[in-house]
Amino acid sequence: MPTTFQEIPRERPVTPLLDRADTPAGLRRLAEADLETLADELRQDLLYTVGQTGGHFGAGLGVIELTIALHYVFDTPDDRLVWDVGHQAYPHKILTGRRDRMLSLRQKDGIAAFPRRSESEYDTFGVGHSSTSISAALGMAIAARLQNDPRKSIAVIGDGALTAGMAFEALNHAQEVDANMLVILNDNDMSISRNVGGLSNYLAKILSSRTYASMREGSKKVLSRLPGAWEIARRTEEYAKGMLVPGTLFEELGWNYIGPIDGHDLPTLIATLRNMRDLKGPQFLHVVTKKGKGFAPAEVDPIGYHAITKLEPADKPVAPKKPSGPKYSAVFGQWLCDMAAADNRLVGITPAMKEGSDLVDFSERYPERYFDVAIAEQHAVTFAAGMACEGAKPVVAIYSTFLQRAYDQLIHDVAVQDLDVLFAIDRAGLVGEDGPTHAGAYDLSYLRCIPGMLVMTPSDENELRKMLSTGHHYKGPAAVRYPRGTGPNAPISGDLEPLEIGKGVVRRQGGKVALLVFGVQLTEALQVAEQIDATVVDMRFVKPLDEALVLEMAAGHELLVTIEENAIMGGAGAAVGEFLAREGVVKPLLHLGLPDIYVEHAKPAQMLAECGLDAAGIEASVKARMAKLGL
């Protein structure tokens, strides 16, 4: 196995067993004794594939053995296998007939980064966000019961995803309806238990066996006739198991808990899964794995190797790096530290995105004011609301796509009470290879309809810093949405002064057309304006809208064009149109933004071009409308 990133193979490794087992039917024809070798081959093939394409890395390496065991024991796709989030599903894709397409992973018109129902019958449920698998598998299990179908439903969920309330809602419901399903906890952070070894594996085999289950049920029937005897026996059993396994919580929720077992021990996995396959009711298997298993750098640094970029060809000349600005998330991280130094009321909150949202420095400099609430977006928002009630100034750093999960809390717990909570909304707009489940396509639409909400869209790095300060000083809920990646390298001022609320800026004065830009498409709009002699306005604020400036532009131009990287329906452009309609102003309007589709995964530049939001697309759309109007 390679020991460094550069040693990842650039040519497909020789894999004679995997060549025969790239479908579950082929896998089941292998002897059980061959599966260890198959796991080695699959791990090498995964390293090769992701090395060529880039993508999620560590989680897949950690579930090689579990994936093999699941498809070996269960009759997939008839038995329903649901992966939570989907970061770990690359080995599943390789083993379910898509190996020959893996080099198109996360590329335009290629296979998706996550399980997709439209891609394969083995992808029983589309995922991307966390903590949905148990609910989905439970729904499938109950549907199977209603159809008198004996198929099994299996959910595979990580220990991080299990922190979300939705997962526990499903666990609680499953025992109430006595669902015939299996939940597998993929514990790859060892945050729940380190109790793994020969004794634990042996105990798991015993507790999951049909003999044990039948003896347990028989004893229950006998002892239930004796007053108090069954309760004593039950507590004795729980005490004995509790000394060896940490399953009390799940047992109390009504699940038959087995484990923890070593998730890289194929014989134990297969024996345990075979036993549990035949058990009725809600079954819970705790499997401990190592993220990045088999690739030393990923084992040492599972966060850094959660995902990787693709390998460059060995003979590719090193091109000089083009100067670029800092990432927008880095600008936010620096502002957070600066404002924290100036205002000791500031606290930073994130739902498990410390690295992605660039809160690492803040967490180290202000540990007592930093709160990672885990994958719990609803809790994050109401937690912030509670702190705001007591005079704190919470900043919730959250991805646009994940804020959708806390919309009720945003309205009910923050906005209705007019609390001072600032939402730093990262990954707004199109995010690229992760596709539609991760796109921040709707935040302007769902934020601007909330009374009292301040909504801002920076056009560059300096504007982001100023808007964050504006939101921090605002009395009430505020949101700043900014994209993934770097900006145009605008000079950044070091001050913390706010902007004048609700005021846009004319960046270029032109002729008959005015381009009203909400966000980072300002750079492209300025390029287009040079070709068609247009006025360009950096609108800055979606709410409150600079109504005076909109009226001025309408009076002085023959066509208004709104530009935003958000859904056209209900977005910033719609706000302009609604305002003009209220004022009785009739003016030709062209709205450019994200169409009413789910934009499929591709490179960000390809996605913008597909939506007509690159410079060429904007210019073509404006010229077409100008021609139609005779301008």
UniProtKB/Swiss-Prot annotation:
Thiamine diphosphate binds at residues 87, 128-130, 160-161, 188, 295, 377. Binds 1 Mg(2+) ion per subunit. InterPro entries: Dxylulose-5-P_synthase (IPR005477), THDP-binding (IPR029061), Transketo_C/PFOR_II (IPR009014), Transketolase-like_Pyr-bd (IPR005475), Transketolase_BS (IPR020826), Transketolase_C (IPR033248). Keywords: Isoprene biosynthesis, Magnesium, Metal-binding, Thiamine biosynthesis, Thiamine pyrophosphate, Transferase. One of its GO terms (molecular function) is thiamine pyrophosphate binding. Its cofactor is Mg(2+); thiamine diphosphate. One of its GO terms (cellular component) is cytosol. Homodimer. PANTHER family: 1-D-DEOXYXYLULOSE 5-PHOSPHATE SYNTHASE-RELATED, 1-DEOXY-D-XYLULOSE-5-PHOSPHATE SYNTHASE, CHLOROPLASTIC. This is 1-deoxy-D-xylulose-5-phosphate synthase.
